[in-house]
Amino acid sequence: MRPTFTSSHRGGSGSPLVCLHGFTDTWRTWDLVLPALERRHDVFAPTLPGHAGGPSLDRPFGVNEAVDALERMMDVAGLTSAHIAGNSLGGFLALQLAARGRATSVVALAPAGGWRRDDPLFSDAIVEHFTAMQELARAAAPYADSIVASAEGRRRATEFITTEFEHIPAELIAHQICGVAACTDVGPVLEVAVRDGWELAAERITCPVRIVWGSNDKVLPWPSAAARFREEWLPHADWVVLDDVGHCAQLDTPLEVAELIG
């Protein structure tokens, strides 16, 4: 069955919370934590521009353009500020929004951009990973339902982003495969990221920040991918390392992540 992609999710009641997904993902990466979060929060989870279900792109976006787009989305949603949680690229964008004064707190799960500037091989590895991942996803997407019908298929489909997969619904894994395949402009967006680099005006962040990292992250390995956050940008943040957890902690250990978001 071909999945349906939507531009955002809104649900729950309480203090406002914005949840931001990672590169090539969609808002549904938060599916497993939403029930717990929506008991305490008015949750707004948008899909980023250029991603499956999200706004189309006139040109490949960089970080500033992505943050501009998220500010517009928050404005339309009636959110002047909010608690913000983000994974990977979404974690980095959450911190950028905090630097613009739009966050009352941030929980960043394995945020992107924290590797050392003098490590070009890291950037090259990220580009190669996402390029290869999308090629695989596009080849697999027509067969996604068949792939996730077996435990081995579900394990292989999630092995780079989680260490545990048994609790993740097959339908959600199939949606993830097809979402990666449908993400537009992966190559050009990565080129912009490499060209522009990753910078954070951390001195402008005045809200509480918690950074969460899985010790078994295969996409942004701990601790090398966190170097600039730990040494330069946010050494005094509340740091949490989750043992034997992968890159997408919200999928790997959803109950623990819901508690960490608060």
Regions found by a protein language model. Give the residues of each.
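Catalytic histidine-centered segment of alpha/beta-hydrolase-like enzymes
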Residues: 239-258
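Conserved HGGG/HGGXW glycine-rich cap/lid loop of the alpha/beta-hydrolase fold
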Residues: 9-56
